[in-house]
């Protein structure tokens, strides 16, 4: 039970220590939908899905937060950033902190983001991505590298794994609102990297970084909220505010 609790709380409690392992520095502003959630410090990632709304993980919830857009080097003001506060932070009504099911939330911005070459929205899915689809996960942090570029946005390309492989890696823990992506042999992983951050496949937001066991370990891939299953709630909620 102790190890189970550690697994489930890893992303939520240690979000500010998350790191991508085996990845590379993203081309500047190639992930212009990527945002940083800030509460005096960076604590989670997220994705801009319209000029007014950000998607993140429910386990990243804070009642009030600031969204930083247009970032690349998170500790340097590069002149491309926009800082916008939240007006509403809304967790999925069926989110479970016990098993991290339905791990998604929406953040309404107090003012619209200015869309430009540094900041733009990513599309929500109209269908689920197929197994083996290659996707990109992004986030800040790479402290397991000999060259620590963790303050610069990191990217990792990784495939969606089958439900069977995912369930075999985490028996009894994978729900219909989750999927696994990564490499069963280990060595490359988002490592919750940043919790709440995007998994983008062919230009569409298919995943939200959620949880996992360890970091880049064999047979323990990263687990992500399955946006295609949750997108109905996302669209309905955005339309009702």
Swiss-Prot record:
UniProt-listed SMART domains: Tryp_SPc (SM00020)
Peptidase S1 domain: residues covered: 20-239
GO cellular component, one term: extracellular space
Keywords of the record: Digestion, Disulfide bond, Hydrolase, Protease, Secreted, Serine protease, Signal, Zymogen
Domain of life: Eukaryota
Natural source organism: Gadus morhua (Atlantic cod)
SUPFAM superfamilies xrefs: Trypsin-like serine proteases (SSF50494)
Subcellular location(s) of the protein: Secreted, Extracellular space
Catalytic residue list: 59 (charge relay system), 103 (charge relay system), 195 (charge relay system)
Propeptide: 14-19
Principal cellular location given in the protein's record: secreted
Cysteine pairings via disulfide bonds: 26-155, 44-60, 128-228, 135-201, 166-180, 191-215
GO molecular function terms attached to this record: serine-type endopeptidase activity
Signal peptide as annotated in the record: 1-13
Any single GO BP term: digestion
Enzyme Commission code: 3.4.21.4
The protein's name: Trypsin-10
Principal EC category: hydrolase
InterPro entries reported for this sequence: Peptidase_S1_PA, Peptidase_S1_PA_chymotrypsin, Peptidase_S1A, Serine_Proteases_S1, Trypsin_dom, TRYPSIN_HIS, TRYPSIN_SER
Assigned protein family: Belongs to the peptidase S1 family.
Chain coiled-coil ranges: none
Positions marked as site (Required for specificity): 189
Reaction catalysis annotation: Preferential cleavage: Arg-|-Xaa, Lys-|-Xaa
């Amino acid at each position: 039970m102790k190890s189970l609790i550690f697994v489930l709380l890893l992303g939520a409690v240690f979000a500010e220590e998350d790191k991508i392992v085996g990845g590379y520095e993203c081309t500047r502003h190639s992930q212009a939908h990527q945002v940083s959630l800030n509460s005096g410090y960076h604590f989670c990632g997220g994705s801009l899905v319209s000029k007014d709304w950000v998607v993140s993980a429910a386990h990243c919830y804070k009642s009030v937060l600031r969204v930083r857009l247009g970032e690349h080097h998170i500790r340097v003001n590069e002149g491309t950033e926009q800082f916008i506060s939240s007006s509403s932070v809304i967790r999925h009504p069926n989110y479970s902190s016990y098993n991290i099911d339905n791990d998604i939330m929406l953040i309404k911005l107090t003012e619209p983001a200015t869309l430009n070459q540094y900041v733009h929205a990513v599309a929500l899915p109209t269908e689920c991505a197929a197994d083996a689809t290659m996707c990109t996960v992004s986030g800040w942090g790479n402290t397991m590298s000999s060259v620590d570029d963790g303050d610069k946005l990191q990217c990792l390309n990784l495939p969606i794994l089958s439900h069977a492989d995912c369930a075999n890696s985490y028996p009894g823990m994978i729900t219909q609102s989750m999927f696994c992506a990564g490499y069963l042999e280990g060595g490359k992983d988002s490592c919750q990297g940043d919790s709440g951050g995007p998994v983008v496949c062919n230009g569409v937001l298919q995943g939200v970084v959620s949880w996992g066991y360890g970091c880049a370990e064999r047979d323990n891939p990263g687990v992500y909220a399955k946006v295609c299953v949750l997108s109905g709630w996302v669209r309905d909620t955005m339309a009702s505010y």
